[in-house]
Amino acid sequence: MAPNLRKSHPLLKLINNSLIDLPTPSNISAWWNFGSLLGICLLTQILTGLLLATHYTADTTLAFSSVAHTCRNVQYGWLIRNLHANGASFFFICIYLHIGRGFYYGSYLNKETWNTGVILLLALMATAFVGYVLPWGQMSFWGATVITNLFSAIPYIGQTLVEWAWGGFSVDNPTLTRFFALHFLLPFMIAGLALIHLTFLHESGSNNPLGILSNCDKIPFHPYFSLKDILGFIIMFLPLTTLALFSPNLLGDPENFTPANPLVTPPHIKPEWYFLFAYAILRSIPNKLGGVLALAASVLVLFLAPLLHKSKQRAMTFRPFSQFLFWTLAANLFILTWVGSQPVEHPFIIIGQLASLTYFTILLLLFPIAGALENKMLNY
């Protein structure tokens, strides 16, 4: 009998073991769709990004008009740009839901997979930030100025570090050039990291909604979950294309339709919606270095998730206290996102401070306590 090519060929074998004959728990829900959706997001962003890069000029005098030229004169340039800009939003929606799923079902106990995932999140945030600077509108310029300036809070080396990153004494042409280089490079690094993420995942196999070992009940990935993933793609592409075609600027900032002007500061400097929760945490601390540390901690705290797991059960499926805390945390993140979009005045300052305190308290203190308490409840 001739050997099956997809099982014997060195390259096809890799694809086969990852996407076709992969043993998958039979009971994974739609929450497990977001990994493949993130892969599709990445491919879409790389494709639209490459097409945009062919028409973009990384120069302060030409960047803004080159983007306008792409939208006006290039065949379907407006569509490519709208898909790329809104695709970033969908990328973040998917990654936040993916992380939320991992948190709820205890997937962070696969430590290597979880840690590479957090590094992926940081890489994605860096990519989105440098990408937002490229159109060289007002919010691009001032966003770059404000966020890069945060590094000056680092004692002793801060100011030198910022000027080194800028390539001068302010955000200018060298900054734009290197940000374009970084924005081009990082997605390919993300793709590489995603492969490492998958390699670690396939070492242990997928978790499932019950948080228990599922070796006794696995089914092949194809056709069951490949088909389910295609449904997921359709469900994601519908709102993405709807947004890109009907209301492409809904999530953007009107300030960015004005070319960058170092002499005029916008009334409210704020990042895109997907960074607002972290921005709110940054602003809630009146000290510069303290704010920067809190901003870093807001994402880096995810690395501690495996260490703070005190429950005997993996998933939160049968843990009511942890469930309550989880959904409180989700609501709290919405509040932080909203506060981040508001001006720095009463009552938003105090709301932001309380929400920031709640965020860290739930993650670092209440989750371990709830886990230990639920262990006690198992005895009754």
From Swiss-Prot:
Can you provide one Gene Ontology molecular function annotated for this UniProt record?
metal ion binding
Q: Pfam families, from UniProt?
A: Cytochrom_B_C (PF00032), Cytochrome_B (PF00033)
Q: Does the keyword Iron-sulfur apply?
A: no
- Positions binding heme b b566 in this chain are 98, 197
Please give the subunit comment from the record.
The cytochrome bc1 complex contains 11 subunits: 3 respiratory subunits (MT-CYB, CYC1 and UQCRFS1), 2 core proteins (UQCRC1 and UQCRC2) and 6 low-molecular weight proteins (UQCRH/QCR6, UQCRB/QCR7, UQCRQ/QCR8, UQCR10/QCR9, UQCR11/QCR10 and a cleavage product of UQCRFS1). This cytochrome bc1 complex then forms a dimer.
Function, as annotated, reads:
Component of the ubiquinol-cytochrome c reductase complex (complex III or cytochrome b-c1 complex) that is part of the mitochondrial respiratory chain. The b-c1 complex mediates electron transfer from ubiquinol to cytochrome c. Contributes to the generation of a proton gradient across the mitochondrial membrane that is then used for ATP synthesis.
> By what name is this protein known?
Cytochrome b
Provide the species name: Alca torda (Razorbill)
